[in-house]
Amino acid sequence: MTMPAGKYYLGDLCYCLHDVWDECCDLMFPPGTAVREVEGEFQLRDGRRFASFGTAYGDGEYRSSINTLHSVDSGSIGCILLSDIRDNQYSLEQLQELGAIVDFEAPFEVESDQGLLKFGPVLIETAPDYEDEELEA
């Protein structure tokens, strides 16, 4: 899936989409279906687009390849254009502390591959191989 170039919030979208969180949840967890979670790109009724992917281990903190720490309370990490954030519950500075503000100069691909979340060149590993880390210790 391709997202357009621009400045994005990259993190748990529950922090910046309070005003439409019920609609987001209905898109990601369609009511009346047995689907656990739908991942990928979504469009809100008002036309705003976002991408969201579930983390391998749910809530917690996950480090990115650009050395930002992403706090997660909804079990997912996504991206949305800063200009599409209308919820002011958190300031821009607070959102940066909870995730990252990334300026993508060109359209970028988003995907999830066995817990590795990819937002263009930014990677967030949500399923680290703890077994390998234990062997190295």
Feature annotation, model-predicted:
Residues 1-137:
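Intrinsically disordered, low-complexity acidic regions enriched in Pro/Ser/Thr
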